[in-house]
Amino acid sequence: MDSENSSSHSISSPQMFQNTHNNSAMEDNLLSRPMNNESLQMIIGYLRRNGLTETEELLTREAGPVLRVEGSNGLPPEEAISVEFDTFVQHANDCTDVVQAEFSQLLFPIFAHSYIALIEKHAATARIFFNRFKIFIPECFSEFVYQLSLIEDAMTLRANEHVHILRENKFLVRLSRPTLKHLESIQTRVIGVKNIIAKHICIENADEVSTNRTTIETQMGGILGVTSKSDKRHKMMFSVLKDELMQNIEKRKTKGKDWKDMGKKMQTHCPQADRIPLPPISEHLREERRNWLRDVGKMAIISAESPVSICMYTTVNAPIGVASCDFTDDSSLIAMGLSDSSIVMNAMDPMNKMKKLRDMEFLDKIDIETADNVQSQMFDLQGSTTSVRYTGHGGPVFSVNFSPDRRLLISSAGDRTVRLWSMETQRNAVIYRTPAVVWQAQFCSRGYYFATASADKTAAMWSTDRMHPLRIFADPYGDVGCIDYHPNCNYIAGGSDDRYVRVWDVCSGTRVRIFSGHKASIIAVKFSPCGRYIVSLDAIGNLMIWDLAYQRLVAAEITEQAGTKGSITFSRDGGVFAVSHGNSSIQLYSLDTLIGTVLAAGQNDSYIEPKVNLDGFNIGSYATKETAVIGLHFTRRNLLLGFGCFGQ
């Protein structure tokens, strides 16, 4: 980055050393002074500004004892913290733009632990320190800085959740070798800062030296810093076995040409079929896939040259508000979770009404062996309807989701229950009681299992025949607000308020991937149909695409579309995905374009620069007039369905 851009990102300091003399005057002035701490710091600053790195390091090493003895000018410890933090900020300001960006990772944890140390014994001094230096903390940590501002004394300190997290865990940063050399040179002058780094911060060596500031900043934002390289040790079976349906979709997409997305190689990353116990594929599901197979020839391939067609469904006269929605896989039904604790089910086609199973007395009279058209006799055709309302929850319904075979609906609400509804009897079948609110519940692609994201900082895996979770994943540090099941049913992804995206193995219960880079709470997460990529969305509108194979950030789309309810859905061929931020617009992105760019840059490289606001990645933006888009869904022919509540 050039010097002009570098200066635009500088970290200011309240005690900047301003030199108005020329070089010769500086030398004469310094040589005429006794070699005390102040003179040594002036000389070191002069050497740094003139690029004399080796001389600076040599002088710092030789003058270490003097600097350590007089490191804080003999000030009391509570005042020395301010002096040392200001010195650290000034040192970062004198560095190059990339090194300065790496140093900025250290500012928040040093600031936080300095403030925590002061507030316990010197509350008044702590407030002065906080108000003076809070403006130097990167914007991505502003929410955490606000949480620290709520601490007024030792009592509120002990009750603060963020303080417990920072004290019990080390903050992780990743620095390149040049930055580590700068850090070694400054630590001899700021002993208090050095002690904080040694006790509360873990520093890893960066594999590659970043070439620009943006690359470093895209990975910042987590409450405990970036993710560790040691998390890559877990092997992940992220691929999806390609059956006849998937092969036909791929053939339709490529028009007979060879697809270059490592298709053959990815087959080696498929899990064993018996790795987890899955229910057998029912005849109903087989029939659904045969129907889908017949639609493959009519499936549209979406691109920038061939834009998507969107059908928007809007609900009106709903003053209570709609909190959630979901479509069946065949797009025949839509379920709406309302804020008044009820669920409304509508048939998308008025001619295809919902049939209700007859009562038990009538069913007992049917002779299965001799009766004709048993299926038609089991259902009350005259009582079929296009709309059904379910009641039973005691709070807003935050999530609804259909099972793959369309026989069950799962819902979660503010009453701390997850309910399983039978589509055939149109009644509540099971109630799962949870210790906290469940923000989202999601079936796996084979049914039977489902996952939940909860306000008690956990994600969980359940089965429809058990009343208690089979797995509980308790490593997040904040509410898990969104969740998704991997297409091969072996993994669960969750996004939480601590700004990390995590992937758990449902077989072993271990966390196999963790990603950092979001700057706010994560409100939506989605696996790609191929199983290799994850798309996540946060509350301030940032969109991130992660590669599970290399555990890396592939691309980031920085927007200003803040929202609290996000929706992500992939096209049936997996080449495009649609995103809504809970506002009145729909964004379309091309995953194929992104993959092509990564392939051109060298797919086998374990390190690539994340693509930020990549040209050609966003292939369309579609706005509604006043309707907030709550849910999105691609039909089997790649028609995009949107759902929203007018005026919400």
From Swiss-Prot:
PROSITE patterns per record: LISH (PS50896), WD_REPEATS_1 (PS00678), WD_REPEATS_2 (PS50082), WD_REPEATS_REGION (PS50294)
Originating species: Caenorhabditis elegans
Residue stretches of each WD repeat: 317-358, 392-431, 433-472, 475-514, 517-556, 560-599
Family: Belongs to the WD repeat TAF5 family.
Compartments it resides in: Nucleus
Entry keyword set: Nucleus, Repeat, Transcription, Transcription regulation, WD repeat
Major location (coarse): nucleus
Gene inactivation effect: RNAi-mediated knockdown causes arrested development at 90-100 cells and inhibits differentiation. The two E cell daughters (E2 cells), which form the endoderm, divide abnormally early. Phosphorylation of the RNA Pol II large subunit C-terminal domain (CTD) is reduced significantly in embryos. Reduces expression of a range of genes, including let-858, rps-5, hsp16.2, and pes-10, but has little or no effect on expression of cki-2 and sur-5. Has little or no effect on levels of the TFIID subunits taf-10 and taf-4.
Protein known as: Transcription initiation factor TFIID subunit 5
Range of residues in the leader sequence: none
SUPFAM superfamilies to which the protein is assigned, alphabetical: Taf5 N-terminal domain-like (SSF160897), WD40 repeat-like (SSF50978)
Subunit structure, as described in the record: Component of the TFIID basal transcription factor complex, composed of TATA-box-binding protein tbp-1, and a number of TBP-associated factors (TAFs).
Domain LisH: 35-67
Task of the protein: The TFIID basal transcription factor complex plays a major role in the initiation of RNA polymerase II (Pol II)-dependent transcription. TFIID recognizes and binds promoters via its subunit tbp-1, a TATA-box-binding protein, and promotes assembly of the pre-initiation complex (PIC). The TFIID complex consists of tbp-1 and TBP-associated factors (TAFs), including taf-5. Essential for early embryonic development, but not required for transcription of some genes; probably acts via activating transcription initiation by RNA Pol II, as part of the TFIID complex.
Lineage: Eukaryota, Metazoa, Ecdysozoa, Nematoda, Chromadorea
Compositionally biased region (Low complexity): 1-13
Xref: InterPro entries: G-protein_beta_WD-40_rep (IPR020472), LisH (IPR006594), TFIID_NTD2 (IPR007582), TFIID_NTD2_sf (IPR037264), WD40/YVTN_repeat-like_dom_sf (IPR015943), WD40_repeat_CS (IPR019775), WD40_repeat_dom_sf (IPR036322), WD40_rpt (IPR001680)
Residue segments, region Disordered: 1-21
A Pfam match: TFIID_NTD2
Record-level GO cellular component terms: nucleus; SAGA complex; transcription factor TFIID complex
Gene: taf-5
One GO-annotated biological process of the protein: transcription by RNA polymerase II
